[in-house]
Swiss-Prot record:
This is Acetate kinase. The active site is at D148 (proton donor/acceptor). Belongs to the acetokinase family. Coiled coil: none annotated. Its main location: cytoplasm. Pathway: Metabolic intermediate biosynthesis; acetyl-CoA biosynthesis; acetyl-CoA from acetate: step 1/2. It is found in: Cytoplasm. It holds the Pfam family Acetate_kinase. It is an enzyme of class 2 (transferase). PROSITE patterns: ACETATE_KINASE_1, ACETATE_KINASE_2. InterPro entries: Ac/propionate_kinase, Aliphatic_acid_kin_short-chain, Aliphatic_acid_kinase_CS, ATPase_NBD. The lineage of its organism: Bacteria, Pseudomonadati, Dictyoglomota, Dictyoglomia, Dictyoglomales. It comes from Dictyoglomus thermophilum (strain ATCC 35947 / DSM 3960 / H-6-12). GO terms for biological process: acetate metabolic process; acetyl-CoA biosynthetic process.
């Protein structure tokens, strides 16, 4: 069975084609700068070198058409025709409480999803454009929606209800949803596989640390709490997002700086976090280099980031009633020895001890805790695309 996985962003489309017989990636790449000058498609067949094609891409549909053309190209392609694609899996950011698991697209699902686009206005509309393009270009091929939020639908009420007037929850469905669910789901299953224990027996804290970052408490294989909230703005300090702050601060700043709701939203989402504190960059590598050169604000930014993660680890250790495994994943989690060290330093009383030598690992699966560490600490590169492909196979198999 061959599965195409699509992840449509505001100006990009990431794609991968899997042969699910052995979960091998046949081709992958990225269409970027959609609707802008300098648009292009990066294409890689198997493990061959990447090729870059400069192509005008005015719309997401055009980008997907060009991706399909490359997939069946007689020189570069991997398919004799698009009919070889058995199903398409779409990454969708927000399913609200309407979708508690991955679903096959039909008229009812399509219309329900269309009704919750405003839950993630920067993401869901573009996810839908990907679905629309595939329905038009590949009629009859099953389309599956895989939601970032669905893994967290197992949270208990006390974890997801905000202390606001309850009628706001009833009227607007304002509650914690959480994100990066596909990543947290994948690494929790993968680490259980690597240590040879059923995931249902483990207490896991999963740290997805990238430009966007979240942390999840996983008990008996299920998410019981997560740091992101109604939107991806809540929780950890991120590349450009503030994470947890006193809710009165935006109101105060709107008055003092004469800012509109849109302007304050822009500041909290795109000008805060590591970038806001350091004044250097939203890229942790740049901030790390600046800190090494003595930039005090860059150093402070990394300390604030690590401190917040550490607080969440402590909180989740408490609600889990102990901890078996701590997992680091995503860009910083996988490739940030400094950040991992800052986070784990001082957590020895919780049974977390890093091996300094093993902690130098970047981008590989490895247990980085010491032999006498009560908690196993792992680096697990995330693979959301593979998880989406697996979910697609599972859902289509139910049909």
């Amino acid at each position: 069975m061959k599965v195409l996985v699509l992840n449509c962003g505001s100006s990009s489309v990431k794609y991968q084609v899997f042969d699910m017989k052995d979960e091998k990636v046949l081709a992958k790449g990225l269409a970027e700068r959609i609707g802008l000058d300098g648009s292009r498609i990066v294409y890689q067949r198997g493990v061959e070198s990447k090729k870059v094609f400069e192509i005008p891409l005015p719309t997401h549909k055009k980008a997907i058409e060009e991706i399909f053309r490359l997939l069946v190209d007689k020189n570069d392609g991997i398919l004799s025709s698009l009919n070889e694609i058995d199903a398409v899996g779409h990454r969708v950011v927000h399913g609200g409480d309407k979708f508690i698991e991955s679903v096959l697209v039909n008229d009812e699902v399509y219309n329900t999803f269309k009704g919750i686009l405003d839950l993630a206005p920067l993401h869901n509309p573009y996810n839908l454009q990907g679905v629309d393009a595939c329905l038009e270009l590949m009629p009859g091929v099953p389309q599956v929606l895989v939601f970032d939020t669905s893994f967290h639908q197992t949270m208990p009420e006390e974890a997801y209800i905000y202390a606001l007037p309850y009628e706001w929850y009833e009227k607007y469905k304002i509650r914690r949803y959480g994100f990066h669910g596909t990543s947290h789901y994948y690494v929790s299953r993968r680490v259980a596989e690597l240590i040879g224990r059923p995931v249902e027996e483990l207490k896991i804290i999963s740290c997805h640390l990238g430009n966007g970052a979240s942390i999840t408490a996983i008990k008996n294989g299920k998410s019981i709490d997560t740091s992101m909230g109604y939107t991806p703005l809540e929780g950890l300090v991120m590349g450009t997002r503030c994470g947890d702050i006193d809710p009165a601060i935006p109101i105060l700043l709107m008055e003092k700086e004469n800012l509109s709701p849109k302007q304050i939203d822009e500041i909290l989402n795109k000008k805060s976090g590591i970038l806001g504190i350091s004044g250097v960059s939203s890229d942790f590598r740049d901030v790390g280099e600046a800190a090494e050169k003595g930039n005090k604000r860059a150093e402070l930014a990394l300390k604030v980031f690590a401190y917040r993660v550490k607080k969440y680890i402590g909180a989740y250790h408490a609600i889990l009633g102990g901890l078996d495994v701590l997992v680091f994943t995503a860009g910083v989690g996988e490739r940030g020895p400094l950040e991992r060290s800052l986070i784990c330093s001082g957590l020895e009383h919780l049974g977390i001890k890093l091996d300094p030598e093993k902690n130098k690992v970047k981008g590989e699966e490895l247990k980085i805790s010491t032999p006498d560490s009560k908690v196993e600490v792992w680096v697990i590169p995330t693979n959301e695309e593979l998880m989406i492909a697996r979910e697609t196979v599972r859902v289509v198999g139910k049909k």
